[in-house]
Amino acid sequence: MKRLPLLLLFLALPLHAWTRASDLKIAKKAIEMGPPDLRLVLDRYAPEFQRGLQKAESDEGSAEHHYFVLSRTGNLRTRIDLETKAIISMIHGRQSMAVVAERLGMLSHLIADANNPFHTADDDRRLGVAHDDFEQYFERRMARFPTVFYGLDPQFRPSSYFDKTFARTRKFYPLMSEEYFRGGTLRTSADFDDRSTAFGVASVCYSHAVTDLVNLYYFIWKEAGGDVRSAAKMRSSDGRALNAN
């Protein structure tokens, strides 16, 4: 009976991916580090970009927002590819940059999903009730996450790059099982501190989401014929991660 209030707490949480605040912080940091000309565009069309984030969230919980690596189910992986190609085509076709900004907002949300362990694996059925708790925890602790930029991939290709993204994020999922059921009983994020496994996973997922988005922004802008000369200084000469705070 002691576990009933805990379960009720989980059930009371809204069903989301990363929260809107989390999505915005990831996107804003990536825009700040992206191609300067693209940054000017997205600053000018910030309302449209944010509307894109909101649109992407509208069908959250559907197969469009997950790709479970082991079972190969869900459309998130394919949707990232399709949105990337569509945006490049729109820029080439001289579509309104307001519309492009909106689609980039949608794509930004999808990249954040790809860096969420709960969107890349579902093989521990016990964790279903912890999904939204972890995402709320991510938002609460986000101000304490350093932004570690892992660099631009000089050989960036969306397909192979995001294969690695999904494989990496999926490896964090067992750590969620370990954290939420440490000691054999269900816990909540109220039990976690900044030395916890959950904090470490959340922090790393944040930095990888920013890094992935910066890489994708540079790729899109380059493929669309934009100026990406700033890419040279975004690469670490010795391959080490860069602290971007």
PLM ranges: what are they?
Residues 4-12:
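Sec-dependent N-terminal signal peptides
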Residues 16-102, 120-245:
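N-terminal, motif-rich segments that launch catalysis or mediate targeting to/interaction with membranes
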